[in-house]
Structure formats: C-alpha cells, structure tokens
Amino acid sequence: MAYKRNYRRRKNRQSGRTIPGIFIFLVLMSVGMAFKNQSSQLLRNFQSFKPANNLIYNTNNLQLSQPIIPGNNHQVRQGNYQNIDRLARSINYQGNSLSELATILSKYAKTEAEKARIIYVWITHNITYDVASFLRGNYGDASPYVVLKNRFAVCSGYANLYQALAEKMGLKSAVVIGYAKGLGYLVGNASDANHAWNTVRINNAWYLIDATWGAGVVNNNQFQRQFNPHYFATPPAQLIYSHFPEQTQWQLLPKVYRKQQFDSWPIVTSQFFRDGIKLVNHNSYNIQSSGITEVILQVPPHTQISAQLQQNNLPINSHLPLIQRVNGQAIIKVSFPQAGSYDLMVFSKNKSDKNNFNHALSYRITSNAKGVSIPKTYATFEENNAYLYSPTIAKLTKNQLVNFKIEVPNALAVVIIDQSSGNWTPLTKSGNLFFGNVKVGSGKITIAGKFTEGNNYASLVEYE
C-alpha cells in the first residue's frame, strides 16, 4: 500500500453565470480539474515490520547455486492471466492447511509464472490488512499457518504466506527485508527495516512481488481491498522508488543504489508508472524555492494530471497550481502564500477513465519567500490543451490596458469578460492563438472560449 490520494469531480460545481443570449459554463478546477473533496482522503501504505515478526525464509537464508538473474518483467507482467485471476478469485478455501491450499492452487496453475500469479491473486483477495494490530504496534504471530487461519496480517504475514505457498508449489522464493516509503517513514532514518516483500524465481530468473501493497489501501484507519496488479513482477527500476532492500542484490538492477539516494527521490506511486509519467527537471523530493517553482513532467497525451498545494496535510485552495501542456510536457507552476514548507501533490488518470484522479507524485517544497499569485484555471483550459502566455499573475493592475495572449486549440473565439462592468472584448485570432490589449476594470476578469456554433462560452482563466 502506497501514499495515494483520490479525487472525484465535484457534483456541486460553481453555478454558471448567465448573460442574455450568452451562457458561460463555469466549472472551477485546480489546473482544469474539479474535485469533490477539497481535503481528499489519504490512502496509505503502512510500515508493518519488526525483526520479531519471525520471517520464515528471508534472503539471508537463501542458498543459491546460480547467479541472480533479473527476469523479463514485461514478458511476465504482460502474460495472459485473465483465466488464472478469475480462478484465483473463485477459490473459496475456508481451511487452514497450507499444503491443502497449495494443492488446490496447483490444479489451476501449471507454469511457474502461473503459480507465482495465482498465489499473488489469492492472497491479495483473501488476506485482510490488520490495521488494528498495526495501530497498536503489536503485530502478533506472522507465521503463515496463523495468517491463513485468521485471514489477517501485516506485511510480514503477507510475505510469509506467499513464501510458504510458493515453496509448497515448487517455486524458489524468499522474503526480502527492507525499507518502504509508507506511513511514518522518515527520510534518512537509519533505524531498522520497516517492510517485507518477496522475490520469486520464474524460469531461472528472479522477480519482485509485494502482496501487501497489491491487496489494497488503508483509508481512515479502515482497510479497503483494492487489487493492484502493479506489485506483481514489478519492474525493479520502478519498485526501487518505493522499496529499498537491505541486501542490495535484490534491487535486481545493473546499477546498485544507496539508501541515501533512495531517500532523496520524490514519492511516486504505481499510478505514476501506470499513466506513463516521467520526471524532467526535479529528481529530488526536497525542492528549494524563492516564492515560485516550476515542476516539469513528461506526460503522454492520454494522461490527464492535476495538482494541489498542501501544508500540514491541508489543501491551500487560495493558491492553485497552474498546469500547462506543451510538446508532450506538463509544466506545473506553483506559487506560495508565504515562506514555509509545502507539499505539492500531483494526481493523474487516463482520459478515458471516469474514475477518480489518483495520487501519482509528491514533492516537499520549502520556500524562503512569498510568491506572486497565479491565475485560476478551469476545466476547459486543461481539456483543450490551452496555453497561457500572458498575463501569468493573478492580480491585474486595475483600470489599465493589459496584454492578453493565449493559445486555445479548437476554439472558434476567445473573449475577455470584465465582471465589474459586464463588458466583453473579443481577442484577435491567428490560428490557435488569441491576443489583444484590453482595458480591465476593478473586478474579476475571465478569459472564456467558444468551441461550438452559437453563443455558449466556457471559462478558461480567471484573474482577481
């Protein structure tokens, strides 16, 4: 389970402003995305390991007669597991015999990849994360027999059960001990390891598996089962961002990383990799700022992103980040209300997905100064890949000429609306670019675009 936030589109959107003959569709979103819950829910991956948990067969005891060869993760991950997954979910085993369960699972899985997968799916669908024990700090007996009997476990129990079933089904496997960026993990903390996961050999090559993080999330101190296939045969270059093994050979990477490097990286989740996002200009979790910061990400066309600035786990709705897309990149511009330490939370989803935005990436930004506030953007801005050239500050000089320049693909017309006077001023169109000098009044100013024939305009940007 990893740090993860979900947002939903706000049902009670800001009411539209109607002017005779014209309808403005106002849908306020942070950088083009509306959220149902401004505070949101934090879904967490817990630390849940102590040496006293008695791991039954960890990598310290693993005797290898051959070199550790990393597997072809793409080949194993992209296998056709639809039938195996369906069978694993249908097995309603109520007993407490490891051998009996292994025999049942083996009936449906013939190859080593199928065996590794059916164990993963069965455990993630049948073992519940023991939140109560975690919160008490007393994790109890993590032996595979007890875990199977009680159907509750923290990470060591998940890892032990996976290991025991793998062994009984003829797979070479072990428990990996290390550090995971879950709840309470302190960067730079040199204390004992806090997590356990598995390594398994498939066709003479090794793969990494975390059934705990694949089982679900914890929300408001309640476990929510939420199967995540990402943590089955996770590519080592992705898992290293969140999992650091004590024995570095189980990074399964050609280059070995130090824990100091692990601690320095941003917090990224499975959503980050699922949506094909890549870091461009900030590879460290901690960023220093002088009032305004830009984070640049490589984002595929099919991925939508949004962002939120937080302080002390609370959203700062007065300073919404500005996200602009250009040349396959998303530029996230953040301004800070005052000097201090902040969290920049980035969320993503596939454009075709009607579900929530999920937490993809986090940075900790420390600013030594107050930043100039930036304009507020609306849903239509992001949906149409608009790009604002000027002005890029939220507070405009009153009763003065202001140069407006904005690129809005697909727009038939763009206007500047002075909400204090009700004046509408069209901008000059040149291809997808709209520009012009407009005298602004003393109230809010809105940039709105028309995308269909008729008199309907949608809000793009708002100034104070």
Identify the meaning behind each predicted range.
Residues P20-K36:
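Hydrophobic membrane-insertion alpha-helices, especially the h-region
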Residues P20-G21, V218-E464:
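Alpha-helical and coiled-coil interaction segments, frequently adjacent to or embedded
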Residues M1-G16:
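N-terminal Lys/Arg-rich, disordered targeting/topogenic segments
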Residues V121, N160-L239:
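Hydrophobic/aromatic-rich core segments of domains that either
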Residues N58-V154, N160-A164, M169:
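Secondary-structure boundary elements
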Residues L98, S106, R117, G216, ...:
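Cytosolic catalytic domains that perform sulfur/thiol-centered chemistry
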Residues Q47-N61:
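Short extracytoplasmic/periplasmic juxtamembrane "stem" segments immediately C-terminal to an N-terminal membrane anchor
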Residues G32-Q47:
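Hydrophobic single-pass membrane-insertion segments
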